[in-house]
Amino acid sequence: MKTFSATPADIDKKWILIDAEGVVLGRLASIVAMRLRGKHKASFTPHMDMGDNVIVINADKVQITGKKREEHFYWHTGHPGGIKSRTKQQILEGAHPERVVYQAVKRMLPGNRLSRQQMTNLRIYAGTEHPHEAQAPEVLDVKSMNKKNTRS
């Protein structure tokens, strides 16, 4: 039997809505990355963008375990003495709290052109409102998938 290799005509993209309120960040990012790549489908083909379109709401209410809220992100501006840092807590309380979820998902995908294309299928919103009601997204309840996905 020949190995199945999907063609662009075989790809069926769905819209998935995930509520991130109270969900552990790493577990959420792992589930979202798997959906973006399409590894949950039996027809998965590694070189094709066959994942679903994923909408994540309430990204500002994501749960972070342990002392990871106090861990620093470091970057350099390129200027002398230009080392900068922020904690996850500062980012979540800042203007763009959805960036914590975005970076977690991005770092769970391979670092190639295909994963950059797959990241365009991810939409993250800090609040409950999103402009994708017309796509009729299917709700994926991450909390009920496993009791370890949420932390009280």
Curated annotation (Swiss-Prot):
InterPro entries listed in its UniProt record: Ribosomal_uL13, Ribosomal_uL13_bac-type, Ribosomal_uL13_CS, Ribosomal_uL13_sf
Pfam family, any one: Ribosomal_L13
Keyword RNA-binding: no
GO function term, MF aspect, one: mRNA binding
SUPFAM superfamilies for this protein: Ribosomal protein L13 (SSF52161)
Keyword line: Ribonucleoprotein, Ribosomal protein
Disordered, as annotated region: 129-152
Entry GO CC: cytosolic large ribosomal subunit
Gene3D superfamilies registered for this protein in UniProt: Ribosomal protein L13 (3.90.1180.10)
Any single GO BP term: translation
Subunit text: Part of the 50S ribosomal subunit.
PANTHER family, alphabetized: LARGE RIBOSOMAL SUBUNIT PROTEIN UL13M, RIBOSOMAL PROTEIN L13
Matching HAMAP family: Ribosomal_uL13
Similarity annotation: Belongs to the universal ribosomal protein uL13 family.
Summary of the function given for this chain in its UniProt record: This protein is one of the early assembly proteins of the 50S ribosomal subunit, although it is not seen to bind rRNA by itself. It is important during the early stages of 50S assembly.
Name of this chain's protein: Large ribosomal subunit protein uL13
Gene for this chain: rplM
